[in-house]
Amino acid sequence: MSTTLAPAVGAPPASGRDDTIPRLDLAGVWVVIPCYKVRSHIGRVIARTPDWITGIVCVDDACPEHSGEFVTREVADRRVVVVTLAENQGVGGATLAGYGEAIARGARVLVKVDGDDQMDLAHLPALVAPILLGQSDYTKGNRFSSQSHIQGMPSVRVLGNIGLSFAAKLSTGYWNIFDPTNGFTAIHADVAEILLSRPIARRYFFETDLLYHLGTLRAVVRDIPMPARYADEISNLKIGSTILPFAGRHLRNWARRMIGDYFVRDFNIATLEVLVGGASLAFGIAHALAWISVRLPGQAASAGMVMGAALPIIIGVQLLLQAINYDVTHTPTQPIHPYLRTVKQMAATDKLRALSAAPDRRD
C-alpha cells in the first residue's frame, strides 16, 4: 500500500481517490545527509528513513571517521549514494554538494537531515507536503511553535535562538519564521538549483544565509512545528567564537537586503519613508546636540528649541516604523517553483522542437 499525504478537510471519501493528494512514493523526495563525525549515528538515521524516500545522498565532508566508507561498507540500502569531498567544506558545503548530486539524479524535493540522529523523521511528510502541494518553496522545522516543544532544550540555546531569530527576521525579511538555525529543512529542486551558484555561507551560518538568498528570489518559506530532540551528540559549534561573526554577517545581509529591495529592485513608499524618516531623525538629534554644545550653564531650553528637536525625531521615528510595517507585511506569499518548473519544461519543449526541425545532414 503506497504512502500518501493525509487528506484535507472536505476531501472525498476513501472509496474514491483524490488525485490532488500527491503520492509520496512517486514524489521524487531525496534526503541529503552531511556526514562529519557521525559514524556512530549514520546507520541508525538511514535505517529510519521511510520507504517512500526515493534516494539518500550521504556526503562525507572529509570526515576523520570516514563515515562515507562506513556507509558504503555497512549499509545495504540501495537508495544510498555516497559523495566524498576531498576537503572539509562545512555543513553548508556538504549540503549543497548533496543537493547537486540529488538534482542530477532527478530529485524533485530535497530534504536536509543531520547525521547525528537529532531529527525525528516522522515529521518528513509534514515537511514536504507544503512543497508538493505548491504552497511553499522551502520549509523548515520550528522548535518554538509550542512551549512543550522546547522542554529539555538548554536555557542557553533557548535565549540564543530567540536572539538569532530576531536578527534573522531583520536580515532575511522573513518575519513569519522563527528558529532560523534549525537544520531540518526541505526545498524544491528547481529553487535549490538556482542557489547552487550563489555565494552561500558554507559553515554554521549556512541555514540563515540560505534564507537571505531565498529572500532575494522572493521564495516562500514556511515553518513546520516540531519538538526539540537531543541525543548523545557532541556539537562542533563554539558559541563564544561565533557571536561576533554571526552579528557581522547579519548586519551585512540586512544592509544588502535594504539596498536591494528598496533601492535597486524596487522603489516604493517604504523607500521614501526610510529616506525622509532617517533624515528627519538625524536632523532632530543633531539639532538637540548642537544646542546642548553651545548652551550656557543653567540655561533652559525654550519651547521652540524643544519642539525644533522633538518634532523631527517624532516624525522620523513614525516614518521608520511605517517602513518596518511595510517590510513585515510584504513577506513573499507566492511560491516561485511552479513558475520555474513551467519555464524549464517550456525550454525543454522548444529545444526538442528545434532539434526535430533541424535539417537532416546525414550523407
Please give the residue ranges for each predicted region.
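Short hydrophobic beta-strand elements that form part
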Residues: 30-34, 57, 84
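Acidic helix N-cap motif at the loop->helix transition within catalytic regions
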Residues: 40-44, 65-74
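A conserved acidic beta->alpha catalytic loop
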Residues: 60-69, 87, 117
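Cell-envelope/extracellular polymer assembly enzymes that use nucleotide-activated donors
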Residues: 28-30, 55, 209
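Hydrophobic helical membrane-anchoring modules
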Residues: 2-25, 200-363
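Short, well-formed alpha-helical segments that are part of the catalytic scaffolds
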Residues: 16, 36-51
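Acceptor/aglycone-binding surface of glycosyltransferases and processive sugar-polymer synthases
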Residues: 85-104, 109, 121-204, 230-241
